[in-house]
């Protein structure tokens, strides 16, 4: 373990703003502002202030520069000057992840706006409320291939929940209020607001609150009672039910209701990658995460179930495996606020469209009214599942070459930082190990890019989470591949006084790609060696120091606990720990892409035969 080299203290450390006491949907504030004549840019800033925004992540540029002038005078808005627009988008997403409030990012036209495409697609796929404000060339230049012109509305139409091109300054308050409402209501998502430069520079009439005009947008939040009653009947008749829980339970603030339903009925629970923390890992009914790298018990529960109670989940291919062999004997209750998700991948015997908290609350009342909980017979089912859980627990062994095990590092980090910390992962092996070996007890304590699988997500998302929760310990768990995509945002953290901590799982490779090459391409390791082991290029400790962080390195198991505690003791600047781990470590269990969940391997060459586990039930 190398000794830390502490960089000079940053010269500028603004106090972080806390979002703890802000309303989740501040657009509903009753405050009225009389008519005023402002520039369009001033109207943007005033609207954001009235909407309760406290932080914006962005970079100025020509087309959006008019907004930055009144921003300079705002006493309510903190602006975080990121080093790349992708960082702004992911930081806004991280902020929204942990608070449930809308995250805001801002960029100029052309390349500034196009650099937001990936984070907007990421937020949309994972149902994260984000509003991006982009400058655009003047209205008279649109369509002329003007300098830094890009049709960002057209580009982002397929990857956002909605987007706007503002054509009149008078529309700015209404459009921004609508954007926030759309982003945060129903199924949350990403919204883009594109504003031409001449609209920002021109005069407009400002008043607040504006009258929103969204006649075609009415999310159905109240579930149909008849459907809930039918769901209760299926639950009463089931003998092998499973609560299949997705990220919508967290987005819908329904985790307490989920626990009440689970404990009332005694039904086993599986939580998808996006739902880790929705149900406590310490709870005896929690079977863990299902899917490609899920627990054998969770996968077995879905495959052998006779009833799936799917709550706020979308039957993603990484959970279902080969769809026509997924849960072949199960009937399906599918509750989701987005009607487009119901029946999209799996037929629902009882579809329920509505807010998941309302669905669960009404379902609990229905079950109690009909005295159903005491009639569900699941002794054999639980005996079977406990047998699977006992036979195939999540585990890992030492590396054959004696190198540091990444699973050990992540497991120890989770134990030491504890359930009150927030963990943010990039994408790849380290993401899966963090999902598997850290025990999540609370919602919004686990952030990752689940749907889009965006490398480079962790550092900027952790930055956004730390700004939202300045009193919470925030760890970015990143791989050496992901880290090299967005590590420049550590300079932002150092300058802005955002003391995130980074556990860098450095295996010298694009680890997940290398694992697939090992399993499916005869160990032909084409273009996956990053040279971060063989040449130490870059030297991550030196890089961390150059970015204004403390840099640490750990290569031995006996040093892991000490170096984590050393990092935890540093709270005035960011810290990066370069964990040198084995290059050949692999993520298990695994269901190969495109195959049936029945073909899960607990470890390489070890395939559980679910029907042979006969402790009480086959």
From Swiss-Prot:
Q: Which residues bind thiamine diphosphate?
A: 85
State what induces this protein: The expression is high during the mid-exponential phase and low during the stationary phase.
Chain sites annotated for binding FAD: 187, 293-314, 336-355
Q: In which pathway does it act?
A: Amino-acid biosynthesis; L-isoleucine biosynthesis; L-isoleucine from 2-oxobutanoate: step 1/4; Amino-acid biosynthesis; L-valine biosynthesis; L-valine from pyruvate: step 1/4
Top class in the EC scheme: transferase
Task: Write out the catalysed reaction.
Answer: 2 pyruvate + H(+) = (2S)-2-acetolactate + CO2
Question: Which Enzyme Commission number(s) are on file for it?
Answer: 2.2.1.6
Q: Which UniProt keywords apply?
A: Amino-acid biosynthesis, Branched-chain amino acid biosynthesis, FAD, Flavoprotein, Magnesium, Metal-binding, Thiamine pyrophosphate, Transferase
Q: Which PROSITE patterns match?
A: TPP_ENZYMES
The GO biological-process annotations, alphabetized, read as: branched-chain amino acid biosynthetic process; isoleucine biosynthetic process; L-valine biosynthetic process
Q: Where is this region: Disordered?
A: 1-30
Q: Which cofactors does it use?
A: Mg(2+); thiamine diphosphate
| Annotated positions binding Mg(2+) | 480, 507
Cellular component aspect of the GO annotation: acetolactate synthase complex; peptidoglycan-based cell wall
Indicate the quaternary assembly: Heterodimer of large catalytic subunit and small regulatory subunit.
- Functional note: Catalyzes the conversion of 2 pyruvate molecules into acetolactate in the first common step of the biosynthetic pathway of the branched-amino acids such as leucine, isoleucine, and valine. Also involved in condensing pyruvate and 2-ketobutyrate to form 2-aceto-2-hydroxybutyrate.
Protein name per UniProt: Acetolactate synthase large subunit IlvB1
Give the species this sequence originates from.
Answer: Mycobacterium tuberculosis (strain ATCC 25618 / H37Rv)
């Amino acid at each position: 373990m190398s000794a830390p080299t502490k960089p000079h203290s940053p010269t500028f450390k603004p106090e972080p703003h806390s979002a703890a006491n802000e309303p989740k949907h501040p657009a509903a504030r009753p405050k009225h502002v009389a008519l005023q004549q402002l520039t369009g840019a001033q109207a943007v800033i005033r609207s954001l202030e009235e909407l309760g925004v406290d932080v914006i992540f962005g970079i100025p540029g020509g087309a959006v520069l008019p907004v930055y002038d009144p921003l300079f005078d705002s006493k309510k808005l903190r602006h975080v000057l990121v080093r790349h627009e992708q960082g702004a988008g992911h930081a806004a997403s991280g902020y929204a992840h942990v608070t449930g409030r809308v995250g805001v990012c801002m960029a100029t036209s052309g390349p500034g706006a196009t650099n937001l495409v990936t984070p907007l697609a990421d937020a949309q796929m994972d149902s994260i409320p984000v509003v991006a404000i982009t400058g655009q060339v003047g209205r008279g230049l649109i369509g002329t291939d003007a300098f830094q012109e890009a049709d960002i509305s057209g580009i982002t139409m397929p990857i956002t929940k909605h987007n706007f091109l503002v054509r009149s300054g008078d529309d700015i308050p209404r459009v921004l209020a609508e954007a926030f409402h759309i982003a945060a209501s129903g199924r949350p998502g990403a919204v883009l607001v594109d504003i031409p430069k001449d609209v920002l520079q021109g005069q407009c009439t400002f008043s607040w609150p504006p009258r929103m005009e969204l006649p075609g947008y009415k999310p159905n939040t109240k579930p149909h009672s008849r459907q809930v009653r039918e769901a209760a009947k299926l639950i009463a008749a089931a003998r092998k039910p499973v609560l299949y829980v997705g990220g919508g339970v967290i987005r819908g603030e329904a985790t307490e209701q989920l626990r009440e339903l689970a404990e009332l009925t005694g039904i086993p629970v599986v939580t998808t990658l996006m739902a880790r923390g929705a149900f406590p890992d310490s709870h005896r009914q929690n079977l863990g995460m299902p899917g490609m790298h899920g627990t054998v018990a969770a996968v077995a529960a879905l495959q052998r179930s006779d009833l799936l109670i799917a709550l706020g989940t979308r039957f993603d291919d990484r959970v279902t495996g080969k769809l026509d062999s997924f849960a072949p004997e199960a009937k399906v209750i599918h509750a989701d606020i987005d009607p487009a998700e119901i029946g999209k991948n799996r037929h629902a015997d009882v579809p329920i469209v509505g807010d998941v908290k309302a669905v669960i609350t009404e379902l609990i009342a229905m079950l109690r009214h009909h005295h159903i909980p005491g009639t569900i017979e699941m002794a054999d089912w639980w005996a079977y599942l406990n047998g699977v859980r006992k036979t195939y627990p999540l585990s890992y062994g030492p590396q054959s070459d004696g190198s540091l095990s990444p699973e050990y590092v992540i497991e120890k980090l989770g134990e030491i930082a504890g359930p009150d910390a927030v963990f943010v992962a990039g994408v790849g092996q380290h993401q899966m190990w963090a999902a598997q070996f850290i025990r999540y007890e609370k919602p919004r304590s686990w952030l990752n890019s689940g749907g889009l699988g965006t490398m480079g997500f962790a550092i900027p998302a952790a930055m956004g989470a730390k700004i939202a929760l300045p009193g919470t310990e925030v760890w970015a768990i990143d791989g050496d591949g992901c880290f090299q995509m967005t590590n420049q945002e550590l300079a932002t953290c150092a300058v802005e006084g955002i003391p995130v901590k980074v556990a860098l799982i450095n295996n010298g490779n694009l680890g997940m790609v290398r694992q697939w090459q090992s399993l499916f391409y005869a160990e032909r390791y084409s273009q996956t060696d990053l040279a971060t082991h063989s040449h130490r290029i870059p030297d991550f400790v030196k890089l961390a120091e150059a970015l204004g962080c403390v840099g640490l390195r750990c290569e031995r198991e006996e040093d892991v606990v000490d170096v984590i505690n050393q990092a935890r003791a540093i709270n005035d600047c960011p810290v990066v720990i370069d964990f040198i781990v084995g290059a050949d470590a692999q993520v298990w269990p695994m269901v190969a892409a495109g195959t049936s969940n029945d073909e899960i391997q607990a470890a390489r060459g070890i395939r559980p035969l679910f029907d042979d586990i006969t402790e009480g039930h086959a």
